[in-house]
């Protein structure tokens, strides 16, 4: 599988099957991956192979770059369907994630009020109150949950710190339905399912 490391802080727009014309917002360094999972299927590669040397983009850098891109798109197109927080790892790790969400909402309302704001996250930071509240304010709060099987999570998602699926599931309930949970599909054989 080819490895993709995204520019920072803004990339695209790209055409997404699920989301439409998507302008990417990468809150992580542009030269590597920073994530609380080390998934075997990650398009950004393994954490150990792509450790960033550059710093995180600042809140101001993100806001300025996003505004410049949105101004350009308002003059020249294309019209974005969605502004998507994704990129080189887990976006909610950024220490100013909540403030950046507020900035993004204000800029979206100014330039493309019909565009949605999406966050693609692995849900490991939803216990931080400021992250939880920020995720409640986006249009598409997309929190990955590959399975509720702890063994599978350890083998495939490979959390880099404390991770208890039962705690995550309980916290997901606190979103009261304002969450999208994509589930991955894995080919299993009958002996695997029965074991």
Model-based region annotation:
Residues 2-27:
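Short, charged low-complexity linear segments at domain edges
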Residues 65-84:
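Short Fe-S-cluster ligation motifs
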Residues 187-195:
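Single conserved hydrophobic/aromatic residue that forms the stacking wall/gate
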Residues 23, 117-119, 141-143, 179-181:
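Hydrophobic faces of well-ordered beta-strands that scaffold small-molecule active sites
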Residues 52-67, 92-137, 145-150, 159-163, ...:
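Canonical radical SAM enzyme core domain
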Residues 111, 171-179:
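A structural motif corresponding to the C-terminal end of an alpha-helix
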């Amino acid at each position: 599988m080819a490895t993709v490391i995204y520019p920072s802080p803004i990339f695209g727009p790209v055409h997404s099957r699920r989301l439409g014309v998507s302008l990417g917002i990468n809150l992580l360094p542009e030269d590597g991956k920073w994530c609380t999972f080390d998934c075997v299927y990650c398009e950004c590669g393994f954490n150990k192979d792509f450790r960033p040397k550059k710093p995180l983009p600042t809140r101001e850098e993100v806001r300025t770059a996003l505004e410049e891109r949105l101004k350009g798109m308002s003059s020249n197109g294309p019209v974005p369907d969605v502004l998507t927080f994704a990129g080189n790892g887990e976006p909610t790790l950024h220490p100013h994630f909540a403030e950046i969400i507020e900035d993004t909402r204000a800029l979206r309302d100014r330039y493309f009020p019909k565009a949605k704001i999406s966050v693609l996250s692995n849900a490991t930071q939803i216990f931080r109150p400021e992250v939880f509240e920020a995720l409640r304010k986006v249009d598409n709060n997309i929190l990955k949950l590959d399975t509720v099987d702890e063994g599978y999570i350890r083998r495939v998602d490979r959390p880099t710190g404390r991770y208890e699926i039962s705690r995550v599931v309980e916290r997901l309930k606190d979103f009261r339905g304002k969450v999208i949970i994509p589930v991955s599909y894995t080919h299993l054989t009958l002996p695997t399912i029965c074991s």
